[in-house]
Amino acid sequence: MKKTGIINSEVSAVVANMGHMDWLSIGDAGMPVPFGTKKIDLAVDKELPSFMDVLNNVLKEMKVQKIYLAEEIKDQNPAQLENIKKALPDVEVAFMPHSELKKSLTKTHAFIRTGEMTPYSNIILESGVTF
């Protein structure tokens, strides 16, 4: 049994298999996942686990060089945007319309579904390198 880090076997495997510039997405309970995109469903109840709990745990093991967020988060969920910026203070942020973010999920290695119930709590993480 793993002693530290992500203990969910599917999430751990996806993070371990990431290469430079690969994408991984994490999102709220309502985000539609395109057919063909691997979905890792962690949601067990409303707000359980939260988006930020999952993001913070993934960030312990994954080097991120850029993130993609929905433009709408700026007006519709500024508190969550602030949480994300605090978790990734030195990472480039790219905004796109929510409709484009949804389409971009087809390019991610997996989508991790949380129990989050706040709007636009979705992110695409672009993997960096550790050297």
UniProtKB/Swiss-Prot annotation:
Cite the annotated pathway: Carbohydrate metabolism; D-ribose degradation; D-ribose 5-phosphate from beta-D-ribopyranose: step 1/2
- Please indicate if the UniProt record lists tRNA processing as a keyword: no
Q: Where does substrate bind?
A: D28, H98, Y120, S121, N122
> Active-site residues?
H20
Catalysed reaction, written as an equation: beta-D-ribopyranose = beta-D-ribofuranose
Q: Where in the cell is it found?
A: Cytoplasm
What Gene Ontology cellular component terms go with this record?
Answer: cytosol
Q: What is its EC number?
A: 5.4.99.62
A Gene Ontology BP annotation from the UniProt entry: D-ribose catabolic process
UniProtKB keywords: Carbohydrate metabolism, Cytoplasm, Isomerase
Subunit and partners: Homodecamer.
The free-text function statement in the UniProt record for this protein reads:
Catalyzes the interconversion of beta-pyran and beta-furan forms of D-ribose.
Q: Which HAMAP family is this protein grouped with?
A: D_rib_pyranase
Per its record, how is this protein called by name?
D-ribose pyranase
Gene that encodes it: rbsD
